[in-house]
Regions:
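Active-site-proximal loop/helix segment associated with metal-binding centers of metalloenzymes
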Residues: 1-45
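Residues at the C-termini of beta-strands that transition into short coil/loop
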Residues: 9, 130-131
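Short, charged, surface-exposed secondary-structure boundary motifs
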Residues: 16, 86-88, 135-138
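Cap/insert and terminal regions of metallo-dependent hydrolase folds
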Residues: 33-39, 43-50, 54-130
Length: 138
């Protein structure tokens, strides 16, 4: 109940672009951009809680698409991979995006380096994620 699968994530900003993660060779050779990257959204009383995979499409693209699909502006929280590894302009702009959207709960997991988590935590509290973590969403 109140769960939405987002499907393929469109590119909605100018700082998160897909990068090929490899090359697939079948009858011909082509780059693999992981077009099947997606997320799940819980629509609760207080807003949206987003559960991501690796976020190859970009965490901000995923959040923007979730807001559009669910017709809701408030993001209560995000858990999953954010696909952020380096201290970069992309990370800086992602942190700015998180702040502008007043995201209450951030749970970066896999596909986020320690340096990136520490940089995010300077501006926004980052919750530690581990085996057995329970998050109650209403």
């Amino acid at each position: 109940k109140n769960i939405t699968f987002l499907g393929e994530i469109p590119m909605m900003n100018d700082f998160e672009r897909r990068h090929a993660i490899g090359v697939i060779e079948e009858s011909e050779r082509y780059e693999d951009y992981v077009m099947d990257d997606s997320a799940i959204v819980h629509q609760g009383k207080e807003g949206l809680f987003i559960i991501t995979g690796c976020s190859h499409s970009g965490i901000c693209n995923i959040i923007e698409y979730a807001k559009e699909v669910c017709n809701e502006r408030k993001i209560v929280g995000v858990i999953g991979g954010f696909h952020l590894f380096k201290l970069s302009e992309r990370l800086t702009r992602t942190i700015d995006y998180f702040q502008k959207n007043d995201i209450e709960e951030l749970y970066p997991c896999h596909c986020v380096s320690f340096k990136a988590k520490a940089e995010i935590h300077k501006s926004i509290p980052v919750h530690e994620v581990g085996v057995g973590l329970k998050i109650e969403i209403e």
